[in-house]
Amino acid sequence: MEITRSNFKDTLPKVYKAIEEADFLAIDGEFSGISDGPSVSTLTNGFDTPEERYTKLKKHSMEFLLFQFGLCTFNYDNTEAKYLMKSFNFYIFPKPFNRNSPDKKFVCQSSSIDFLANQGFDFNKVFRNGIPYLNQEEERVLRDQYEDRRSQSNGASTMSYISPNSSKTPVSIPDEQKGFIDKVVERVEDFLKNEQKSMNVEPCTGYQRKLIYQTLNWKYPRGIHVETVESEKKERYIVISKVDEEERKRMEQQKQAKEREELDDAVGFSRIIQAISSSGKLVVGHNMLLDVMHTIHQFFCQLPDELNEFKEVTNCVFPRVLDTKLMASTNPFKEIIYNTSLAELEKRLKEAPFKPPKVDSAEGFQSYNTASEQLHEAGYDAYITGLCFISMANYLGSFLSPPKDYVSCRSKIVRPFFNKLFLMRIMDIPYLNLEGPDLQPKRDNVLHVTFPKEWKTSDLYQLFSAFGNIQVSWIDDTSAFVSLSQPEQVQIAVNTSKYAESYRIQTYAEYIEKKNDESQTKRKWAEDGWKDLERKRLKTQYNSYIPQNPVFYGNCFAPSFAVKRSMSPIQEEAASDDTEEVHTHENDPSNPGATEQGKKPKNHKRQKIDSAPPETSDGGSSVLFEVPDTW
């Protein structure tokens, strides 16, 4: 079901009902771009830490717009032994609803726009008829502004009402505006003496309208109604009407209802995300870190600077998430799934040993045909993401005793995959752990190398030719990480570079230590800067100045989101629906399928790096995630 600004209000109850009835939800987003950096390595380096990757994405990706959001709800029918699916495809655009609402700015990446255009994406549905939105802080500010305007009744850009409680003091009018205001008052005097019911004041500036409101508010505390309207030519002018007390109250009620409706319309698509969050349902995505970051950034609050704070916010907004790309990249799937891109994964899961899930579209909802491959339509991508999850979850049922053909999303055997987001192209950290500390591989076989800008990948291979197979991961034009096959070779490589003039080699540990020292120095400088500022404030007796940190989830979250939920927020999910013993094959962990994509082409065959998550499933199940001894 396609949803734009035109039908959003009418379809909102259907969306709410679908979310409420669902067992789990699948989401996907389409963006105006991916990275504003000069190359892919700006966003992805094979030896990023989770903190570095988060910082890069926050810096280089959040200025793009999430302008299409796909939501598929899946509800299991026990009687028919099949899922019923409801698909929604939202077109989103931050159109300001009045002059006080945020006028957002975003950037586009030409390659992304060209790609979507070639896929048949209809940009008119975004830019002409996209659903608006506000985050929590923007909504709060606008509500406060409405309350202020209502209490002040000065209405520079909205309606105002002259009431018995109006100001009793004269208005101070600048000399250059007195002639204009005197003419308006003279016209109003004549208007009150004749039989006309309303009169228009010619278009004027916002400041002049404010003076008109204040003057009439003082001179005529009863009997007239003043409002600002906008013509078809976008000209704003004042209309003055004669009213009695009963009519004034009716107009006041109409005004308040209109304001509430306008604000609800402005909140727009954010109401969908709030409903998803409040439901506590499992949210499934594919390679979904960017989807989660953009969703929080656009519809809830600004992203925090620190990764741990981002995890807290994410757990608050989405108590349970599952990434199908990570699921397909780990035991027991990684030995039988070789390509984890969404389209290829969906095809692979139709073949043995997997079984295609039974999924029908609910009555009145669009059905998709996977043979037509409507990829990069967010609703379709969300749909096949849900199919992939169902197939892999049901496959886990074959390890139960006795085996089960259907595995619920609430099953204990699925829980080890919760709240872990796939990290692209990081060689030895396959996922971001939203529930605790991230994996910390030793990387004692990794070197940090700096060299002249003219060097290419072949120069690095030649430099390390004596050390066998290596892996190169570019950082920028003059530095890269080089991974050796044997950790004991690291010190030899460092020693050979002591007298080199054109390049420098240091261990990964030395590189991290130096980087941390620089960060601490910058932090200390910032703290000292605040101290100097405070001393200057006291010396010059300025007003108290309190530095404010960006608001993450305190003020910008509605009360229902302010408290971190339990990881099982739904009452009926407190107990698992499967208690059978779980048997899994113990396989040696292998590379989860991440491929390094550096700044320059590399023509060597990479070695596999052991990388598998350490968590285990609940309730006596065997280990699905394994950790190499070197971690």
UniProtKB/Swiss-Prot annotation:
GO terms for molecular function: 3'-5'-RNA exonuclease activity; cation binding; metal ion binding; poly(A)-specific ribonuclease activity; RNA binding. The record marks 325 as: Interaction with poly(A). Residues 178-244 form the R3H domain. InterPro entries: CAF1_poly(A)_ribonucleases (IPR051181), Nucleotide-bd_a/b_plait_sf (IPR012677), PARN_R3H (IPR034042), PolyA-riboNase_RNA-binding (IPR014789), R3H_dom (IPR001374), R3H_dom_sf (IPR036867), RBD_domain_sf (IPR035979), RNase_CAF1 (IPR006941). A divalent metal cation binds at residues 28, 30, 291, 381. It is an enzyme of class 3 (hydrolase). Keywords: Cytoplasm, Exonuclease, Hydrolase, Meiosis, Metal-binding, Nuclease, Nucleus, RNA-binding. Belongs to the CAF1 family. 3'-exoribonuclease that has a preference for poly(A) tails of mRNAs, thereby efficiently degrading poly(A) tails. Exonucleolytic degradation of the poly(A) tail is often the first step in the decay of eukaryotic mRNAs. Required during meiotic maturation to silence certain maternal mRNAs translationally. Does not require an adenosine residue at the 3' end, however, the addition of 25 non-adenylate residues at the 3' terminus, or a 3' terminal phosphate is inhibitory. This is Poly(A)-specific ribonuclease PARN. It comes from Xenopus laevis.
